[in-house]
């Protein structure tokens, strides 16, 4: 499998878990913007401090920063890859389209992982991250839904969107993903 994929969905829908699994099973480069940003925060870099303040408010880190990280990883990689957590809005999707065109690595499919808000809140609280409390989580979900609706429509109109309901076991969701990408 030399897919070039996006994993899209609300925080807590299982994107990271499923992306790691798919990447490991098929030799894909897994780029999780959340993990990359948390690594910057942990390192205490200037970008990390800026990202931490934004994330603690339940807001999103700037497009320019995320796109720069993605560019640096993809330009040195010629195989299959999957992006998890980016793009989150139409402007980011258009910037990513331009980058992928420049790198001659066209996107193949977009996997939308869906789950209801109450289950998402419970999953996120169970993770125990410092930036995860119910108020911040519900705000993040609201921001996510507002910003990603046009993104989802964009990929749906291009015929690239595949939907997966991420309830059930990790294995059951993985089977749905495999079927959706077949």
Curated annotation (Swiss-Prot):
Keywords: ATP-binding, Cytoplasm, Kinase, Nucleotide biosynthesis, Nucleotide-binding, Transferase
One GO process term, biological-process aspect: AMP salvage
Record Gene3D superfamilies: P-loop containing nucleotide triphosphate hydrolases
Entry binding sites for ATP: 12-17, 127, 168
TM stretches of this protein: none
PROSITE patterns with a match to the protein in the record: ADENYLATE_KINASE
Location of region: LID: 126-132
GO cellular component: cytoplasm
Subcellular location: Cytoplasm
Binding site for AMP: 33, 38, 59-61, 85-88, 92, 129, 140
GO molecular function, one term: adenylate kinase activity
InterPro entries: Adenylat/UMP-CMP_kin, Adenylat_kinase_CS, P-loop_NTPase
Superkingdom as given in the UniProt entry: Bacteria
The keyword DNA-binding is annotated on this UniProt entry: no
Zinc in keyword set: no
Pathway listed: Purine metabolism; AMP biosynthesis via salvage pathway; AMP from ADP: step 1/1
Domain topic, free-text comment: Consists of three domains, a large central CORE domain and two small peripheral domains, NMPbind and LID, which undergo movements during catalysis. The LID domain closes over the site of phosphoryl transfer upon ATP binding. Assembling and dissambling the active center during each catalytic cycle provides an effective means to prevent ATP hydrolysis.
Complex and partners: Monomer.
Function according to Swiss-Prot or TrEMBL: Catalyzes the reversible transfer of the terminal phosphate group between ATP and AMP. Plays an important role in cellular energy homeostasis and in adenine nucleotide metabolism.
HAMAP family linked: Adenylate_kinase_Adk
Family: Belongs to the adenylate kinase family.
Protein name, UniProt field: Adenylate kinase
Native species: Synechococcus sp. (strain RCC307)
């Amino acid at each position: 499998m030399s897919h070039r994929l996006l994993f899209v969905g609300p925080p807590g829908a299982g994107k990271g878990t499923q992306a790691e699994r798919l990447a490991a099973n098929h030799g894909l480069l897994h780029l999780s913007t959340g993990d990359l940003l948390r690594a910057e925060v942990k390192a205490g870099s200037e970008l990390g401090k800026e990202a931490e303040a934004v994330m603690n408010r339940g807001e999103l880190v700037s497009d320019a920063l995320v796109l720069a990280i993605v560019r640096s990883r993809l330009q040195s990689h010629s195989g299959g890859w999957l992006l998890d957590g980016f793009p989150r809005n139409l402007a980011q999707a258009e910037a990513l389209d331009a980058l992928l065109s420049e790198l001659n690595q066209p996107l193949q499919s977009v996997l939308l992982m869906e789950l209801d808000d109450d289950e998402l809140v419970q999953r996120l609280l169970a993770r125990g991250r410092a930036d995860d409390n119910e108020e911040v989580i519900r705000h993040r979900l609201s921001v996510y839904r507002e910003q990603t609706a046009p993104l989802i429509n964009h990929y749906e109109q291009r015929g690239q969107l595949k939907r997966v309901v991420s309830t059930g076991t990790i294995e059951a969701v993985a089977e749905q993903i495999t079927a959706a990408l077949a």
